[in-house]
Amino acid sequence: MTSGNDVSENLQFIEQQLRELTKQGCQLVVTPENSLLFDNALAYQVIAEELNSGPIQSKLAQLAKELQTWLVIGSFPIRSNATHLYSACLVFDDNGALVAHYNKMHLFDVEVEDEHGSYRESDCFSHGTQPQVIDTPVGRLGLSICYDLRFPHLYNILREQGADIILVPAAFTAVTGEAHWEILLRARAIENQAWVIGVGQCGYHSANRQTWGHSMVIDPWGKVVTQGAATPCNLVAEIELHQVEKVRKAMPVASHQKISNLINNEDKE
């Protein structure tokens, strides 16, 4: 998806793709980060809504209910206080209920060698504080957003909380995406022996932003099952949860973990 600065156009595109994917029998549909709006801090403030309130969330809930599918919105600006927002991943069930949300914990405050140059998400957003997992018909989902991908301990926690599928809606820059996107996704899948679904923005956006795309689904062994390119596309994959059990049983790395036990023991001393 190549989201722009027109919310109605982005929402219309999401609806079109959602209708097409549900015709194919998809039980769970995930959009990229910033899928409803890809713009600047002021624009996010304008469209931001209170959690589980407002016309945009109402429309998304209505679509999920009408089409009888679980819908994960990669990120949407949710108000945290008068001046700041959360970049929140929203999960709607097939009855249209908002059943989970995750506030992005790691904000992208970095310098990138591209036309945009300096990125400061903390100018607009507040840091989330809580990992989030949710049971769905396709498995237990662990939620994360974009820059979170570089912080493996978060994913260890998601696995400890029972996640067997990890979602990574993102808007990786073209520069960082080319260098690290696939490597990081596969690493998180291998480390946690879980399915990883990376859903990326792609193409050119306003404010000299270019995103990498290349959405992909990775199995618990780290194999890329299906992959997109640098242009908008829909990826469809069958998630086989028995592979999670198979890999974890054959190589029980969680029970072999010593570092987390060491840290926990130090905290008790």
What would you call each of these model-derived segments?
Residues 242-269:
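A short C-terminal boundary segment appended to hydrolase-like catalytic domains
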Residues 44, 90, 101-108, 216, ...:
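Short beta->alpha transition motifs characteristic of CBS
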Residues 81-161, 174-176, 183, 249-253:
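Active-site catalytic loop in hydrolytic enzyme cores
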Residues 73-75, 88-91, 132-134, 215-217, ...:
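Short beta-strand scaffold segments in enzyme catalytic cores
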Residues 1-5:
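Short polar catalytic/cofactor-binding loops
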Residues 52-72, 140, 146-235:
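CN hydrolase (nitrilase-like) catalytic-core segments centered on the catalytic cysteine
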Residues 47, 102, 134, 199, ...:
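Hydrophobic residues at beta-strand termini and immediately following loops
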Residues 7, 11-95, 101, 172-188, ...:
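Cys-nucleophile CN-hydrolase/nitrilase-fold catalytic domain and related Cys-dependent amidase chemistry
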